[in-house]
Amino acid sequence: MKKRFFIGLAVVLAVGLVIWYVSPIRIADADPADVGEIVIFNGNNGKLSRITDADEIEKVMETLHSVRFMRTKLAGAHDGFNLDTAIYLKSGERAGGWNDFVINSADSIKAGAFFYKAAGGTIDYDYIEQLSKERQE
């Protein structure tokens, strides 16, 4: 009886883990109206950018939120990145959840311990990169 219980528990956990791994996610789940600043550190040139204009924030948030991502692999000790992005609320606090990530390309991000690939659509990477260059400190 105990053995069946543990086998059943292991099966349920394994199925749950598979569902979690293959489920697509959306990044930048903060409401654009609540966002006060988007901070981008450009790994290509070492410059920091702060985006505070409401229209620019809304466009960036829309392009980020429009794409769903699937986990592809563990990030491990991967070196290098393009646009390290953090979203801050108007209160000055860092937004929680999927609001701190690295944009590597129009269809690839790193968030937490995983790399993700776009499952539909792409990020307007060129717009975000250009905006980060225009707002460099």
Where do the PLM segments sit?
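Short, flexible beta-strand-to-coil junctions
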Residues: F41-N45, Y88-G92, F115
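N-terminal export/targeting and maturation segments
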Residues: V18-G76
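Hydrophobic membrane-insertion alpha-helices, especially the h-region
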Residues: F6-S23
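Second-shell loop/turn segments in exported
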Residues: N44-R50, G112-A119
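C-terminal partner/receptor-binding element of secreted or periplasmic proteins
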Residues: A113-E137
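Short, solvent-exposed coil/turn segments at beta-strand boundaries
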Residues: D34, D55-E56, V102-A111
